[in-house]
């Protein structure tokens, strides 16, 4: 591993200002020298300001992902992870959401490609994305409960491409029960 981790010092300092606590900022480089910087934001109110810092640095949004902090043990405790690339360096920030009312502000006005990511969060996990310019569903019928896939389909089924028939049978079965 290299001794000096590359990255834009101004971006690192600006994102670090939205973090608090030990381990909230983490820097690493892999065996090939690819640098990445991780930031745990103190709250959802820091998502748009952090995205603005990255927009100003000409970052490219790579992906927004969600995971369950509880590991499925105590109910759904969502956390979002935003991944950006500023030529050659990855900047990621995470933010924990309220388990009872998961909501996050939209960054689609800053990064147009956040549109689908944020709509998936709403559709599949029932995470409210405040201020999204087009909150329509992408894939699932509007009659299905929002976030249905969070509880209806085991992760092993959802992740196994060979079982996509099982996935859709579960979704359609839930819809038939509602009718």
Indicate residue ranges for each PLM-predicted region.
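Terminal low-complexity/charged segments
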Residues: 1-179
């Amino acid at each position: 591993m290299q001794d000096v981790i590359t990255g834009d010092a101004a971006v690192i300092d600006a994102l670090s200002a939205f973090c608090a606590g030990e381990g909230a900022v983490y820097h690493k480089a892999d065996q090939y020298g690819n640098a990445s910087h991780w930031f745990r934001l103190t709250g959802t109110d820091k998502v748009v300001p952090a995205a603005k810092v990255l927009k100003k640095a000409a970052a490219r949004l790579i992906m927004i992902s969600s995971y369950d902090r509880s590991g499925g043990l105590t109910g759904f405790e969502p956390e979002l992870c935003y991944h950006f690339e500023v030529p050659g360096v990855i900047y990621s920030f995470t933010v924990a959401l309220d388990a009872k009312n998961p909501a996050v502000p939209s960054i689609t006005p800053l990064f147009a490609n956040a549109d689908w990511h944020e709509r998936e969060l709403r559709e599949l996990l029932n995470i409210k994305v405040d201020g999204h310019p087009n909150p329509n569903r992408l894939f699932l019928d509007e009659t299905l409960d929002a976030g249905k896939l969070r509880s209806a389909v085991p992760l092993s089924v959802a992740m196994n491409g060979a079982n996509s028939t099982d996935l859709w049978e579960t979704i359609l079965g839930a819809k038939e029960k509602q009718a």
